[in-house]
C-alpha cells in the first residue's frame, strides 16, 4: 500500500509541476528531466515522512527508513548518471 501511495504522490508532483507552468509561454513549459523530478520527489518525501511518523512499531519504522534510504540512493545515482550521459551526449554532438 505504501508503494502505491508513494507512486500516486510522485505522479501528483508531476501534475502540480505542469499546473504551475501551464500559463507560461510554450517554450518555457519544457524542462530537463532533473527539474521534472523535483516536485514529484518532494511529494514522495512528504508521504514517506508522514508514513514514518505514523509507524506503530520499531520494525515498521526501520523498514520504512530502509525504503526511504534506498529510494534516496537510487535517486541520487539516477540523477548523476543522467547528468553524465547528457553532458557527454551534448559534448559529442557539439564536436560533430
Which sequence ranges carry the predicted segments?
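Cation-handling catalytic/transport regions enriched in His/Asp/Glu
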Residues: 1-96
Amino acid at each position: 500500500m505504501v508503494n502505491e501511495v508513494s507512486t500516486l504522490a510522485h505522479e501528483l508532483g508531476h501534475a502540480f509541476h505542469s499546473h504551475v507552468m501551464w500559463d507560461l509561454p510554450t517554450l518555457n513549459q519544457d524542462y530537463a528531466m532533473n527539474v521534472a523530478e523535483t516536485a514529484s520527489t518532494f511529494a514522495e518525501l512528504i508521504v514517506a515522512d508522514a508514513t514514518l511518523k505514523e509507524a506503530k512499531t520499531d520494525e515498521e519504522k526501520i523498514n520504512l527508513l530502509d525504503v526511504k534510504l534506498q529510494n534516496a540512493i537510487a535517486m541520487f545515482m539516477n540523477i548523476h548518471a543522467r547528468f553524465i550521459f547528457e553532458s557527454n551526449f551534448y559534448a559529442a554532438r557539439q564536436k560533430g
